[in-house]
Amino acid sequence: MKILVANDDGIRSPGLEHLVRMARNLGEVWVVAPSGQCSAMSQRISVFGTLDLQPVPDYPVEGVRAWTVSGSPADCVKVALACVMPEKPDLVFSGINQGYNVGTDILYSGTIGVTMEALANGIPAMAFSTENGEDLRVADAWMLPLVRELLEQPIHPWEVWNLNFPSCDPDCLRGVLYLSLIHI
């Protein structure tokens, strides 16, 4: 499985690195992320000017190809598809965002913007967020098993999964709540 990973918090975000490490358990991982902080950009794309695409040879996760783009999170998906990846990915991951993406926040989220750009290109996607971006214990414990469970069922190119993890002791959780977008 080929997985593109992007985010809105930038190439050096600890959450991105956690997500990339998890994704390595599922297949071949390509990272294309903004060069800086791009929160609340929604699905904004750069229409005028040029974008700077740079390889990141010192990316801290071994075996991962990583680039940075001087544009928005949605630009990262566009650039990955047009200039970086030799083939369309099977799946796009976005995150791990520092803060939940729930309710009307999803309308502004650059993390969700990545998944919407994937959706526009016929690629299924998953967005990952945590309560505060610092305590990733629940995400670390639940992400891989939950993603594997979701991938056991057919995932369609018109689907986006939005996974939000609390910041607490993983033993405090009682389970997973599944909601459709209509329940925002």
Residue ranges and their predicted role:
Residues 3-6, 14-83, 87-88:
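A cross-family phosphate/adenosyl-ligand binding-site feature
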Residues 116-131:
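Class I SAM-dependent methyltransferase SAM-binding "motif I" and its flanking Rossmann-like core
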Residues 145-173:
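A charged, well-structured terminal subsegment
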Residues 182-184:
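Conserved small/polar residues in nucleotide/adenosyl-binding loops
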